[in-house]
Amino acid sequence: MKRIVLLRLGHRPERDKRITTHVGLTARMLGAEGMLLASDDSGIVQSLEDVVRRWGGNFYIKNNVSFKQEIRNWKEGGGKVCHLSMYGVNLPDLADELKKCDKLMIVVGAEKVPPEIYQLADWNVAVGSQPHSEVAAVAITMDRIAEGEPLEKEFPGAELTIVPAERGKHVIENAGE
C-alpha cells in the first residue's frame, strides 16, 4: 500500500488557518496518512484531530516540525519527496513515476518556499504554470497518483457517515464504532 504524507511549509498562523486546514482535509480525504506542519499552530492540530474523531480514519498531524529533519528522516527511510509549485516538471509528465512511488512526501508551501526545498526534493512538480491554491495542487496531484478511486475511500471508526442522496443531507450517527 502506498504511503503518502503531506509536509506543509510557510504556514502563517495569523493568515493561513483556513487554507492550511483545507490542505490537511484534502490530503486526508484523498488518502494521505498524515500532515507535518512546519509551524506552530495548535488550532490546526485541534481542528484536524476533531475531524478525524468525528469522521474516522487514522490521519495524524505533527505540529511545529523541522522540515529539513522530516525530509531527511523520510529519505533515510526510503521515501521520496515531491514539491508542488508552479515551477518544475509538469505534473502530467511525472504522474506515472509518482504513482510507482511506495513512500511519498508531498511538500506544499504557503508563503515563499525556502530555496533549499528545490534541492531537497526528488521532484519539483509544476501543477499548472499559473498562480493557484495549495489546496488545488494537493487535490489534483493526489487524484492523479491515486491507487483506485480516492473518492470511494472508507474511513473506519467514524462517528458520522454521509449517505449519498440525490437531494438533501443524509448523515447517520454510528453507534460505538
Curated annotation (Swiss-Prot):
Pfam families: Trm56. Its main location: cytoplasm. InterPro entries: Alpha/beta_knot_MTases, tRNA_m1G_MTases_N, tRNA_mtfrase_aTrm56. GO terms for cellular component: cytoplasm. Keywords: Cytoplasm, Methyltransferase, S-adenosyl-L-methionine, Transferase, tRNA processing. GO terms for molecular function: tRNA (cytidine(56)-2'-O)-methyltransferase activity. GO terms for biological process: tRNA nucleoside ribose methylation. Coiled coil: none annotated. It is found in: Cytoplasm. Its EC number is 2.1.1.206. S-adenosyl-L-methionine binds at L84, G109, A110, E111, K112, V113. It catalyses: cytidine(56) in tRNA + S-adenosyl-L-methionine = 2'-O-methylcytidine(56) in tRNA + S-adenosyl-L-homocysteine + H(+). Homodimer. NCBIfam families: PRK03958.1 (NF003048). Belongs to the aTrm56 family. This is tRNA (cytidine(56)-2'-O)-methyltransferase.
